[in-house]
Amino acid sequence: MNKATIPIFYAIDDGYAKFVAVSIKSLIMNANNNYNYDINVIYENLSEENAQKLKSLETDNVKIILTEMNQNLSMITDKLGNRLREYTFTLTIFFRLFIPVMFPKYDKCIYVDADTVISDDISRLYNEDLGDNYLGCIVDKSTIDNEILASYFEEVVGIPRDKYINSGVL
């Protein structure tokens, strides 16, 4: 019997390699053996040593796929106005936006931030019915209760405080 494959995505640079390794390991520890997992790591400036360490995490039902972010990177680096607080964020925060274009073979996937620990079987999240929605996410509660953040998102970013989402797991 062929197992269904669940595609999982991460976006990193070399500085986040050790964090994504922990996240992937936690995913593997809680993985459902009735599924295969394609863990796609989209990266910029990943050392060969760290790439090998990530590949070494593969198991019988977990495949690690490393994809360098190259031609798509010019879309976000050519315009200085596209950068949000670059002292806080790296360009990798934008990589998740390219997943549908770069990986059209997947009808559905999960994106996970590199610093996220998976404490349960992620197939349960994957199997949630999204209805007619394109995206499964939650409202970022920190923006609702924090007036400074809420004002920033409403006035600068143009998103109402009750519509700003947490993009760490999509």
Residue map of PLM features:
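Glycosyltransferase catalytic domains, chiefly GT-A lineage
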Residues: M1-L170
